[in-house]
Amino acid sequence: YGIVEHPDNILFTGIQNIQLSDALVAKEKGLDIKLIGQAKKLKNGKVAAFVLPQFVKNGDPLSFVKNEYNGVVIESGFADKQFFYGKGAGSFPTASAVLSDISALRYNYRYEYKKRYHHTPHELTNEYFVKVYLSFDDWKYIPREKFEWIEEWHADADRKYLIGVLPVQELIQNSWWKENQTSLILTVDPIIDNLDIIHLKKRSLELAGIQ
């Protein structure tokens, strides 16, 4: 999308808070948990970008990416989905990348960023919503009023979880979702556009007989 942004301005967290119970829930639902960096153009032309744990379906190409391997999925209007797979760590892949850079320097080769210099870059936005799975030890750590809605919740003696929709701004501005052993994982199709939220709210009111 031609965007160059500092990492501090991108919503991210790792897999450090994922619990065994989360893995068991994933297995029951036929899902895997992967750390995914995602960039998607919204209906308003702006771009949503983040790096967060996410559920993927068994059989999804990303579900087969394990250990030192990385996978990249690219989707375009003309080429549909393309999947790239290969080693992203280890001595040989690292040595190959370093050798490639040394060779590029020797021949004065420079990487091109045509979209940055010859096109108007798209704009990042945090004005959208995400559908999340959230597991936790106690309800007192969870600000339920911050959710647009909660569509599922489950409670055991030791661990609880819910599935609901949150504004991304809530995750950016607050840290409760990665404290007190709280685990947040995006659902399979997590991004909900502002326009979709407005439509869903209107439809809910119509079904309730308010409009």
For every predicted segment, state its role:
Residues 16-19, 38, 54, 82, ...:
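Residue-identity detector for glutamine
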Residues 48-134, 209:
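Catalytic, metal-anchored helix/loop core of enzyme active sites in primary metabolism
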Residues 100-211:
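A conserved regulatory-domain signal marking ACT and ACT-like small-molecule sensing domains
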Residues 27-29, 34, 40-46, 57, ...:
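Context-gated lysine
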Residues 1-64, 69-71, 90:
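Substrate-binding/catalytic subdomain of NAD(P)-dependent oxidoreductase enzymes
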